[in-house]
Swiss-Prot record:
Principal location class: host cell
Organism of provenance: Influenza C virus (strain C/California/1978)
Family to which the UniProt record says this protein belongs: Belongs to the influenza C viruses NS1 family.
Gene Ontology molecular function: RNA binding
The protein's name in its UniProt record: Non-structural protein 1
UniProt KW keywords: Host cytoplasm, Host nucleus, Host-virus interaction, Inhibition of host innate immune response by virus, Inhibition of host interferon signaling pathway by virus, Inhibition of host RIG-I by virus, Inhibition of host RLR pathway by virus, Interferon antiviral system evasion, RNA-binding, Viral immunoevasion
Statement: the UniProt record of this protein carries the keyword Cytoplasm: no
One GO location term (cellular component): host cell cytoplasm
GO biological process, one term: symbiont-mediated suppression of host cytoplasmic pattern recognition receptor signaling pathway via inhibition of RIG-I activity
Function, as annotated: Prevents the establishment of the cellular antiviral state initiated by host RIGI, which normally triggers the antiviral transduction signal that leads to the activation of type I IFN genes by transcription factors IRF3 and IRF7. Also participates in the up-regulation of the splicing of viral mRNAs.
Gene name of this polypeptide: NS
Pfam entry (one): Flu_C_NS1
Length: 246
């Protein structure tokens, strides 16, 4: 049994429990989804217990420690408005500005964007990959990776988009057009995987109500604890974006 699988179960146990503690904020469809998530998580726990023995209470406790140890609630209430477009309709995004220390030990976040040959930092390049469109502006290495999610309990769907947000110029330096996932539980699992991979969570006003128990607007710094910036990781990530084109 991999450590990653155990952590995932612990996270789901913690989130399901916390969401059900706030039933007054959930409509019937969402509550049913969370109950289903809790039931499936308990089944996973029983299967895993033969390899990694722990109780339901242990899983909740470990899940809470994992959240509190890696995801920090934003201190600033200042938001930078932006939007993503899905099926011809624009949806607003609220970005939580980065205020995670020790930012001085990660100078790649503070270095200026490098203009291209004609001095234009924001010349967008369009890519098409697996039915999605990626807009990548050039030469920005000071981004924070953001996942925006928008639950729709009435249709039991969750929409999400991946965004690169420049910390220096406070502009979007790249985004992947929003997609829809059938099933809120499935969508939340996808968001969890993205957060654990170093994405920031961004939500709109409606999502704050539904996702507040899983720390809406929380931040996770992929370079947290590094004494020096992980430039190789950054360059590899930017290269992967460029290679995502046709």
């Amino acid at each position: 049994m991999s450590d990653k699988t155990v952590k995932s179960t612990n996270l789901m146990a913690f989130v399901a429990t916390k969401m059900l503690e706030r039933q007054e904020d959930l409509d019937t469809c969402t509550e049913m989804q969370v109950e289903k998530m809790k039931t499936s998580t308990k089944a996973r726990l029983r299967t895993e217990s033969s390899f990694a023995p722990r109780t339901w209470e242990d899983a909740i406790k470990d899940g809470e420690l994992l959240f509190n140890g890696t995801i920090l609630q934003a201190e600033s209430t200042t938001m930078t408005p932006a939007s993503v477009e899905m099926k011809g309709k624009k949806f607003p995004i609220d970005f939580v500005p980065s205020n995670i220390a020790p930012i001085g030990q990660n100078p790649i976040y503070l270095s200026p964007c490098i203009p291209n040959f004609d001095g234009n930092v924001w010349e967008a390049t369009m890519y098409h990959h697996r039915g999605a469109t990626l807009t990548k502006t050039m030469n920005c290495n000071c981004f924070q990776r953001t996942i925006w999610c928008h639950p729709n309990p009435s249709r039991m769907r969750l929409s999400y988009a991946f965004v690169l947000y420049c910390r220096n110029t406070k502009k979007i330096c790249g985004y992947l057009i929003a997609k829809q996932v059938a099933g809120i539980e499935t969508g939340i699992r996808k968001c969890f995987r993205c957060i654990k991979s170093g994405f920031v969570m961004a939500t709109d006003e409606i999502s704050l109500i539904i996702l507040q128990s899983i720390k809406s607007g929380a931040q996770l710094d992929p370079y947290w604890g590094n004494e020096t910036p992980d430039i190789d990781k950054t360059e590899a990530y930017m290269l992967s974006l460029r290679e995502a084109g046709p």
